[in-house]
Amino acid sequence: MPRVPVQTAADAPGESREALHELERRMGRLLNIHAEMAHAPVVLAAYQGIQDAITKHGSFDAKTREAIALAVAAVGKCAYCQSALTVGGRAAGWSLAETVAIRDGTAELDRKLAALLAVAREIAGSTGNVSDAAWQAAREAGWGDTELTELFAHVAVNLFTNYFNDYVQTEPDLPASPGLEGWSPLG
């Protein structure tokens, strides 16, 4: 059972309603995570602020963004996020099998993307600390200062949602992704 009840846009605090309507329009429905974030308008605004900055100023294409998100969700073992991001990954052009392989770290990716995901996994798994070897491999694969700095924003927003889902024990409202059947919010 979630620690914070799911609410509708009509029930949410006034400061959250516009954002919820926009999320509902963009996603086709209101997801439990967003309906829970809306209890505290600052939480929903913080999430949307990072997402909007990434959309407006980010340089990664949709497939790269979703691959980063899948890798981070897997490190955090957030089943809710992995299920949501599997849907997002499919929409960005990854096959179902590829989304699972990205999560598992077994995807056959080009050297450049593989190096970027290795850095993302290290950021997510070690409180931001990245080994010199992973950093250098990303540099040698063609990533520059701008992209490696931007990567941190992508990892941060995904850790934000991972932690939030675990914190409030978001109930599933998405189909389980392969390998996550029977999942609960606490995995």
Region locations from a protein language model:
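Hydrophobic alpha-helical segments
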Residues: 1-187
